[in-house]
Amino acid sequence: MRWKNVYQVVDCHAEGEVGKVLTGGVFDVPGETMFDKRNFLMQHRDDIRRLCLLEPRGSVTDTLSIVLPATHPEAQLGFVSATTTEYPVMSGSNVIALATVLLETGILPMSEPRTEFVLEAPAGLIRVSCRCVAGKVQSVRFANQPSFVYHSDERLDVDGLGLISVDVAYGGETFVLVDAGAIGLALEPSEARELCVIGEAIKCAANKRLQVQHPMNSQLTGIGQVQFMGPVVRDGSSLSSRNAVVLSPGRLDRSPCGTGTSARLALMYARNEIAVGDTFIHESLIGARLESRIERAVMEGPQPAVVTSVEGRAWITGLHQVGMDPSDPFGAGFALHDTHAWGPGDRGRHFF
């Protein structure tokens, strides 16, 4: 073989959401923080993302964690997440997949019944606790960076829907949150395509109307995801609900979305719908579940916020060595928009 740009990739999924982990071939990239390293990859080494995630090797549903040396002394390892369109500063499903891969492949030592360590994401430190039995990671719980509400009960004029009420919250990524029942959606698998099309229209309208900027990082602006919320069912101190998260550039998260769960918890707490320590079970359209809770209330700069923890499971599905033959005209990666529910004006925003 005449390959170049060879990478070792472990395939994994966390509650149905594909989360590949790049464990070899990228030793380090410049940057004083993991956020700096993310920016370097985005601006100078986007070829790695394209090679691993775009066609002909990947698909629109794939995501990637690039394992890097940590810059913070408390962290054992760092990582940068990537999707087929962007570089999120935090991804809950990727943390669950990454933690599982790190322990089950021996990159980090496993201790039973519980292994704890710290990962450094571009969003900040993520404290991880894994329940381990007989060499298998049974579940991963992570403590997220602070989550908070940007906008509450805003009226938004959306093409095809008219005026709807929305909220905007941050949980590691920024979400516009919508009551699914209020716009006639039941959150059933048969609605998957419709959810994506409507979600992209809502996101487009929200970005035109509502301004957001993270209080501790002025580079984090804009609304990237849409979360449709089902009704909440309470059983004592345990609450549960279904959701559907539309990720850029218009596809459904197969899991209930870790950062989306954190954003929803922040909104529920602001509305006095959940207390610190209450259990919240989030379920996606495929029946995947994440268990979560609010650990404590904090301030994120001037912003009232909550620290959440989210727990889920992941499974390794394959071991791959990825490379490119220099004679392959399509080897660097490509994407067609037939697999995406692009919103108006969305194409120029993404990394194609």
Regions found by a protein language model. Give the residues of each.
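A glycine-rich beta-to-alpha transition motif near the start of alpha/beta enzyme domains, typified by
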Residues: 1-169, 176-352
